[in-house]
Swiss-Prot record:
Subunit-level organization: Homodimer.
Reactions accelerated catalytically: D-beta-lysine + L-lysyl-[protein] + ATP = N(6)-((3R)-3,6-diaminohexanoyl)-L-lysyl-[protein] + AMP + diphosphate + H(+)
Sorted UniProt keywords: ATP-binding, Ligase, Nucleotide-binding
GO cellular component: cytosol
Stated name of the protein: Elongation factor P--(R)-beta-lysine ligase
Entry EC no(s): 6.3.2.-
Annotated substrate binding sites: 76-78, 118, 251
Keyword ATP-binding: yes
Species for this entry: Enterobacter sp. (strain 638)
Residues the entry annotates as binding ATP: 100-102, 109, 244-245, 300
Amino acid sequence: MSETATWQPSASIPNLLKRAAIMTEIRRFFADRGVLEVETPCMSQATVTDIHLVPFETRFVGPGHSQGMNLYMMTSPEYHMKRLLAAGCGPVYQLCRSFRNEEMGRHHNPEFTMLEWYRPHYDMYRLMNEVDDLLQQVLDCAGAETLSYQQVFQRHLEIDPLSADKTQLREAAAKLDLSNVADTEEDRDTLLQLLFAFGVEPHIGKDRPTFVYHFPASQASLAQISTEDHRVAERFEVYYKGIELANGFHELTDAREQQQRFDQDNRKRAARGLPQQPIDTNLLEALKAGLPDSSGVALGVDRLVMLALGAEQLADVIAFTVDRA
């Protein structure tokens, strides 16, 4: 295919047929387990406050909104799905398009397919087992390795991420030739994320998926803090063959705590010169009404298909990447 033939799909037709078969397999996996498939909006009047996520923004002009209504393309269906949980839907999953106004590359496209599911009355470990079941079925891979965030840092960087101060983190970064970035970085979590990306990720999940759990409490996002160790959050991520596949939580159910985290995110945004984002008050009201104790996970389907097909890049498994859209 010539570089100028941008009307043509980026993925081959055989790969698209294989992708369709995997989507069918995913739906069968959840149907067999009695999990309800749902659809939720791709746009919302609120968006994520996470400082690392950049949503697309658009404007609706119509009856009653002559001045326009700001809308955000969803970076994940999480907030709407939690509202369904609070309404009593039971176990639920969704295959949907998600949007992030960020990078494009081998493992990234600003529009992508997300698999997200929630399990009432599951703890983090039980959900991790179900994710492992899905990966073994779709990827025909070995069962996953499970390590704590603390363990992977101690194994690959010889430091304790839960107790190390910023000086120690910068010293670890220097060993990875990252001093040019680390020496001027004052945020401890950014230093940890830098070390994880360059000092841990390249070494895990090579032969089988690796689950990393109990991230620092400061990186809890929408996860609960562990009752056994308040230094860590009940959050996990999944890595395989150099790719981050999934991110899961034992979900936070406390509306007041969630409000505080949203506010803290917006303060961090202001300090970095980033726009503060509108908080999803409907989610907070759902939490107040009562979200059942649940665990949930978001998994990148395009990356999953790429691994299943042994493809080199997302473009090989997406019909039209953004440069051909």
